[in-house]
Swiss-Prot record:
EC number of the protein: 2.8.1.13
Gene: mnmA
Protein name: tRNA-specific 2-thiouridylase MnmA
Residues bound to ATP: G13, M14, S15, G16, G17, V18, D19, S20, M39, G128
Biological process annotations from GO: tRNA wobble position uridine thiolation
Length: 371
């Protein structure tokens, strides 16, 4: 990298939150030629006619003016609808539980946004993600963020070398508390703004209500695996494997959990007990396998994996198959593996890549969690 940072243009994806605000502030302090871009991915006027994106953009403007950088808003609603939201709905129609954040990073934040940034002469793009990139030989490795509780490599597992070579993650080596501290010291307008939660395009809204606006709900029976009818479900798309809340089953004994779905019969299967044997599996088949480096991969990889965000790593053996899928075998049984979610591979702190959980297996038999 050039010793004179002012020759290096970095376009920062600014959301109006504290993380991206501090990202822009740090890069500006380091002397880079910084431009702030606000991505409008969703038309999110709420029931009171207030567009939360407008409020967020107002915060971007305040922060950009405070740190002295130019800023723009760019509309990616069409790309988002085509690449992320359509996928999200299609997965729910199949009875699965998708992870739109993974797709959003792959298709929008590090593709559509990256391409737009390059049209502005960007050498790099930067975001407020808690992750790190490190040059090793000719390749860039993706590493976990230092703050274990905030590490976001799980959502970045589909990024390619071409994308990783163009990104900067200034917050990757920091704890969240440090980031807030920097924002306060710099007097940034977003220093005390609370972190956003939930899926980007739903925001704080009720998930069930939101989904019902796009997919017709079909209520049906809630049964045990032995066929006992325990009640009605509101629509299979509202439930995920291992879910406890919202089932409405009373009575004594241990709580009830979702253990499977029958799409043809429109039946939700439930069983009692957090550790019910049906919730455990020993392997999975994953599709959409992608690796963060271009180096030749052995057919069998010993590593660790995460099957959901903020989960402890599990030791696994990954068998890459001729058809581009992978069989992932767990060292110990894992609870509530959910089709549609990401499986992400790690070698220590290095994120190797990942895929989408397609089918779940136990003792050589496919489990009909979704079928």
């Amino acid at each position: 990298m050039s010793t004179n940072n002012s020759d290096i243009r970095v376009v920062v994806g600014m959301s109006g939150g504290v993380d991206s605000s501090v990202t822009a502030h740090i890069l500006k302090e380091q002397g880079y030629d910084v431009i702030g871009i606000f991505m409008k991915n969703w038309d999110d006027t709420d029931e009171f006619g207030v567009c939360t994106a407008t409020e967020d953009y107002d915060d971007v403007i305040r922060v950009a003016n405070q740190i002295g950088i130019p800023y723009y808003a760019v509309n990616f609603e069409k790309e988002y609808w085509d690449k992320v939201f359509t996928y999200f709905l299609d997965e729910y129609k199949l009875g699965r539980t998708p992870n739109p954040d993974v797709m959003c990073n792959k298709e929008i934040k590090f593709k559509a946004f990256l391409e737009h940034a390059e049209s502005l002469g960007a050498d790099y793009v930067a975001t407020g993600h808690y992750a790190q990139v490190k040059k090793v030989g000719d390749e860039i490795e993706l590493l976990r963020g230092v703050d274990n509780n905030k590490d976001q490599t799980y959502f970045l597992n589909q990024l390619s070398q071409d994308q990783l070579k163009k990104v900067m993650f200034p917050l990757g080596a920091m704890e969240k508390t440090e980031v807030r501290e920097i924002a306060k010291k710099a007097g940034l307008a977003t220093a005390d703004k609370k972190d956003s939660t939930g899926i980007c395009f739903i925001g704080e809204r009720n998930f069930k209500q939101f989904l019902s606006e796009y997919l017709p709900a079909q209520p049906g029976e809630m049964r045990t695996l032995d066929g006992e009818v325990l009640g009605k479900h509101d629509g299979l798309m509202y439930y995920t494997i291992g879910q406890r809340h919202g089932l409405g089953i009373g009575g004594d004994g241990e709580p009830w959990f979702v253990v499977g779905k029958d799409l043809k019969e429109n039946v939700l299967f439930v069983e009692q007990g957090f550790h019910h044997e049906t919730l455990y599996s020993d392997s999975l088949i994953a599709t959409d396998i992608s690796f963060t480096t271009n180096a030749e991969k052995p057919k069998t990889i010993e590593c660790t994996a995460k099957f959901r965000y903020r989960q402890t790593d599990t030791k696994v053996t990954v068998h890459l198959r001729e058809d581009g899928t992978a069989e992932v075998v767990f060292a110990d049984p894992v609870r509530a593996i959910t089709p549609g979610q990401a499986v992400v591979f790690y070698d220590g702190d290095v994120c190797l890549g990942g895929g989408t959980i397609d089918t779940v297996w136990k003792n050589g038999q496919k489990l009909d969690y979704v079928g």
